[in-house]
Amino acid sequence: MKVLILIIASVLLIGVECKDGYPMNSEGCKISCVIGNTFCDTECKMLKASSGYCWTLGLACYCEGLPENVEVWDSATNKCGGK
């Protein structure tokens, strides 16, 4: 019983840090998509995300549950198109 409590306490204290966002290609642009989630889900899972889908309004892949070390697109630090 003590071991179970120790494991639960450890998980709660350590926590699993995850983030959501738009993954970027090598040029710093969002990964484009048009319809369907299969492509984006595959791209996101290659980055160790829990899932991904095509956000149709933005025509870009959106990943959920990305590790903290994966860079995601941010309008403040946008480098896409030489900006």
Curated annotation (Swiss-Prot):
Listed Pfam families: Toxin_3
Cysteine pairs bridged by disulfides in the record: C29-C80, C33-C54, C40-C61, C44-C63
Tissue spec. comment: Expressed by the venom gland.
Residue span(s) of domain LCN-type CS-alpha/beta: 19-81
Family matches, as SMART domains: Knot1 (SM00505)
Database matches in CDD domains: neurotoxins_LC_scorpion (cd23106)
Alphabetical keyword list: Amidation, Disulfide bond, Ion channel impairing toxin, Neurotoxin, Secreted, Signal, Toxin, Voltage-gated sodium channel impairing toxin
Modified positions (Glycine amide) in chain numbering: G81
GO molecular function, one term: sodium channel inhibitor activity
Residues annotated as signal peptide: 1-18
Propeptide segments, given as residue ranges: 82
Gene Ontology biological process terms from the UniProt entry: defense response
Major location category of this protein: secreted
InterPro entries linked to this entry: LCN-type_CS_alpha_beta_dom, Scorpion_toxin-like, Scorpion_toxin-like_sf, Scorpion_toxinL, Scorpion_toxinL/defensin
GO cellular component annotations of the record: extracellular region
Localization annotation: Secreted
Domain of life: Eukaryota
Family: Belongs to the long (4 C-C) scorpion toxin superfamily. Sodium channel inhibitor family. Beta subfamily.
Function: Beta toxins bind voltage-independently at site-4 of sodium channels (Nav) and shift the voltage of activation toward more negative potentials thereby affecting sodium channel activation and promoting spontaneous and repetitive firing. Is possibly toxic to mice, freshwater shrimp and crickets.
UniProt note: domains: Has the structural arrangement of an alpha-helix connected to antiparallel beta-sheets by disulfide bonds (CS-alpha/beta).
Stated name of the protein: Beta-toxin Ct7
Native organism: Centruroides tecomanus (Scorpion)
